[in-house]
Amino acid sequence: MLNKLKRAALGAHTPHDKATAASKPVPMPLPAQVRILMSQHIGAPAKALVKKGDEVFVGTKIGEAGGFVSANIHSSVSGTVAAVEPFRLSNGRMCDSVVIKTDGKQTVDPAVKAPEVTDKASFLAAVRECGLVGLGGAGFLTDVKLQPKQTVDTLLINASECEVWLTSDTQEMLNCSDDIVRGIEAVLKYTGIPKCVIGIENNKPECIELLNQKTKDKPAIEVKALPSVYGTGAELILIEKCLGREVPHGGLPADAGAIVMNVTSVSTLGKYLATGMPVVERTITVDGDACAKPQNLIVPVGTAYEDVLNAAGIKGGVELGKVVAGGAMMGPAVENLSYPTTKTTSGLIMLSAAAAEPPQVNPCIRCGRCVEYCPMGLEPVEVNQAYAARDVQELGKLHVDYCFNCGSCTFVCPAKRPCTQMMGLAKAFYLGEIKKGGNK
């Protein structure tokens, strides 16, 4: 399958709308309250450790990991717990949340101090304690990722940031390069992985130059410039482009000898090792054609979307039509502006009513562009037919489970068909049928 990918898949050339690429992150005004979710990661929710009326500080642990595949949660503000209550997640499920009224002081918890790391066990314990997850959007537990059963020879840092509008990773590279290197060196030292490759798209020459400079005397770390084609940041594509390896069907990056970390994740790890401050804030890109002041904001975890948007403002005379959480290609539309930011929130895109207007959908003209530009070499046209017939075996032959909903097929479709949504439905149907043994 991936041999075909190497020969045929091109990937879409999305607009290089990076108006905030030079926008150095600045702290947003402190909100009156935050709502911190106990589920911000893949795996079991954390268990709330606080109750109404408790005083908390920046860095106070307010949620204990609820299992091996779970993450600690820390307060992003100082103040008083106003409530511990259920909250509906964007996927429809319920989880506990901790509502904190801020006191405006941002007092740091006295317990926050740099961890003592002397060996692999203490390193992994420190990573787990700080609540670090994949900050590129996946939210997988970093300490679990760093304990693969397979033999791994490469730490691969995903610094491609190919999503339209997003520049928070770019700013992390430009402003926190020492933290990035510190995090990488710690991973290599304590896990025994011999080398690291940092993959950066070639439309970020300043980042490539800076990280080359920072690692010039570090032979274990290589900076690799990648083609600026949308989809490069997907793990399977990144591994193929950086290492020339294929991940087996249904496998993990570790099956190809690699561990992949987002560049902001490894930078956050570097900061934690130096300061002891857990994951309590992150840089969020706020942009879009309805945004008055596109910028990168440093946002406390748990801040309501509407508070972040108000900090950037809406253009005068422009009607806000839609807000997208994450990048314009893969991010979901926001239903509720009171929804809180999480560790994995990388951007909020403000679209005008005109830009958000759904296009006129026309019949498929069988042009094949969705096939030509799929970065995974899939065939959305054929998948659509197989899904319409509920043909599980054919969906398997078409490798629908390789789809990662990048949006390329919808982006290039001249008929404006919702190809990505169809692929998502087909994949969910296929995986559900396989799980229960359907179409035998």
Regions found by a protein language model. Give the residues of each.
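Hydrophobic alpha-helical positions that pack around
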Residues: 193-305, 311-316, 327
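N-terminal, Lys/Arg-enriched amphipathic/low-complexity engagement segments
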Residues: 1-49, 99
